[in-house]
Amino acid sequence: AFLNDLEDEFNLELPKRLIASLRSLNSSLSGYQISRLEHSLQGATRAHFAGEDLEIIIAILFHDIGDGLAPYSHSEMAAAILRPFVSEKTYWIVKHHGVFQMYYYAHHSGGDRNARELFINSPWYQDAIKFCHEYDQNCFDPNYEAKPLEFFIPMINDFFSSPKFNEPEKLV
């Protein structure tokens, strides 16, 4: 019981740790006109103004959270963080967004821009295309005025207050 209590206390701080991780994206991966944090804020702002639900807004905010620690598998890392809090659909989209995003740039560096077609039979294929088209590939604009992180903090705190999906089979 003692360790469970300590773990519960630790888990209550998850939103703060996630916000700190988002802030760290402000100084990651040079070469772009904007930071990864600004990129994430642009996507979340666009989703907010488009009327997307909170789950998608949060998924967009955190879709690149793995860039610093898992540059070769950032999509999977972001999806793993979100998994207890999002639907299977959103989990799948975030997990595969890196492959879907390749459509916009892979052909410039010898990659396969159509790699996403491996997933054409997924029920969420078109949703992943929309995610990348509307809230990822177009969110590197140095002139776009995104909402600040502070705008999203109450949403983050609420969303990550407790897992929505904690059945063991959902976490395997």
Where are the language model's segments positioned?
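Metal-dependent phosphohydrolase cores
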Residues: 1-61, 65-172
